[in-house]
Amino acid sequence: MKEESAAQLGCCHRPMALGGTGGSLSPSLDFQLFRGDQVFSACRPLPDMVDAHGPSCASWLCPLPLAPGRSALLACLQDLDLNLCTPQPAPLGTDLQGLQEDALSMKHEPPGLQASSTDDKKFTVKYPQNKDKLGKQPERAGEGAPCPAFSSHNSSSPPPLQNRKSPSPLAFCPCPPVNSISKELPFLLHAFYPGYPLLLPPPHLFTYGALPSDQCPHLLMLPQDPSYPTMAMPSLLMMVNELGHPSARWETLLPYPGAFQASGQALPSQARNPGAGAAPTDSPGLERGGMASPAKRVPLSSQTGTAALPYPLKKKNGKILYECNICGKSFGQLSNLKVHLRVHSGERPFQCALCQKSFTQLAHLQKHHLVHTGERPHKCSIPWVPGRNHWKSFQAWREREVCHKRFSSSSNLKTHLRLHSGARPFQCSVCRSRFTQHIHLKLHHRLHAPQPCGLVHTQLPLASLACLAQWHQGALDLMAVASEKHMGYDIDEVKVSSTSQGKARAVSLSSAGTPLVMGQDQNN
């Protein structure tokens, strides 16, 4: 970049120290010069005292892309110290050569943060200590980097932009010492501001013992000003999880409050300090990024084992009895008991995505999927055997045909194989009838133990005719009145006698004036 390009700078920005005034830069500061939507960064080390606005700097300033908005702070690394500067706009038409002369006039001033006249608005950043003193000191592994201590009135209510011609003075405070310097950090550092690489401290400042949020609580927290656009998304949050230390905490470095206001989310201060009756909530960025907060993680002991049961289990002879507290049914293992408890609670956690049908077990859902896919992996390859009253099987046996039926589950194939072998393993204990499936035996048991009849009969077997006549006495009286008028006789008694098969043998009508008696002979 040639010298005439420096003269065409429409609006230059001078670095302004946070705590002092002056017009020169220290040689170790990485300086950035702004023009419009570009930033000029030094490509080579600076001399002892030089002004980057001078025309002599135009030959080694290289343009870099700049973010849409400018930040209020610039972090400059000086050895192991981190100094924060703010860009100060220079008025249009300022002589760059005059600025260089002002910088050279401050060259021989004593080190430290020195302030000159506030009218000319010249600022400088000096070495906090000389190089010879730095070489005599031992290794600075136990020392912390200085950080800016923002005053209370500046952090709570910043002045408006039109009144902030010069930044408020800020003091540099030493940070608490750290234990050790880690070369490999256990966390991923995301840049909040891609256009400002200097806004993030160097990696050696982040150690296991102290986090940036502990050392410098206001680091990376810009003032709450709506004029600064949102430069970082809340999902790009940094998190540190220290597994090696028992007192490890989860700390997050959040962008300035304007980022949360622009996205319509709550401020970090509101999430950290909720009301007295409200529970603390986690950062929304962590949930959106796919990282769950430790506060929401339930211990594994409450999810597995006997702790998941709503009641304690009993022990007998040193062994745990997996017994249901509702129906008293016992099981051999805990998983079967948990599945059984879903029958009483009505819980069906496994749902089909196609037909929305729910199941109590995952195996049932997997078997149900075969209904939608039409897959029948289980095939019968046994020749037909003549069965009892099974004409089709007899014809197939004569022709020596092989059954090629297919089934979606192995249980259905097992039941089908009983048809070929003629096995009937389920036998009734009352009438000695045998069945191929257990469900057929359960339906057969209802014939031997009929349920008590109610007022409403949905199914009316022959054995419940006597019960029907007993409960509907009023209907029989109405029938008697109608018969007397039209047929000339009354229905005084209905005699119903049934056999064990439930068939009615005799129903007698008499004209005697005796009351209706069920289940008794006419002589009685």
From Swiss-Prot:
Zinc finger (C2H2-type): 322-344, 350-372, 398-420, 426-448
Gene Ontology BP, a term: cellular response to ionomycin
Biased composition (Basic and acidic residues): 130-142
Entry GO MF terms: DNA-binding transcription factor activity; promoter-specific chromatin binding; RNA polymerase II cis-regulatory region sequence-specific DNA binding; zinc ion binding
Domain of life: Eukaryota
Entry-linked Gene3D superfamilies: Classic Zinc Finger
SMART domains named among the record's database cross-references: ZnF_C2H2
Signal peptide: none
Pfam families: zf-C2H2
Induction: (Microbial infection) Up-regulated by cytomegalovirus (CMV) infection in long-lived effector CD8(+) T-cells.
Subcellular location field: Nucleus
Disordered as annotated region, ranges: 130-166, 265-303
Tissues expressing this chain: Expressed in terminally differentiated effector CD8(+) T-cells, but not in naive and central memory cells. Expressed in terminally differentiated natural killer (NK) cells and natural killer (NKT) T-cells (at protein level). Expressed strongly in effector-type CD8(+) T-cells and weakly in naive and memory CD8(+) T-cells. Expressed in terminally differentiated natural killer (NK) cells. Isoform 2 is strongly expressed in effector CD8(+) T and natural killer (NK) cells. Isoform 1 is expressed in effector CD8(+) T and natural killer (NK) cells. (Microbial infection) Expressed in cytomegalovirus (CMV)-infected effector CD8(+) T-cells (at protein level).
InterPro entries from the UniProt entry: Zinc_finger (IPR050331), Znf_C2H2_sf (IPR036236), Znf_C2H2_type (IPR013087)
Disulfide bond positions: none
Function according to Swiss-Prot or TrEMBL: Transcription factor that mediates a transcriptional program in various innate and adaptive immune tissue-resident lymphocyte T-cell types such as tissue-resident memory T (Trm), natural killer (trNK) and natural killer T (NKT) cells and negatively regulates gene expression of proteins that promote the egress of tissue-resident T-cell populations from non-lymphoid organs.
PANTHER family, per database record: PR DOMAIN ZINC FINGER PROTEIN, ZINC FINGER PROTEIN 683
Domain writeup: The C2H2-type zinc finger are necessary for DNA-binding.
Name of the featured protein: Tissue-resident T-cell transcription regulator protein ZNF683
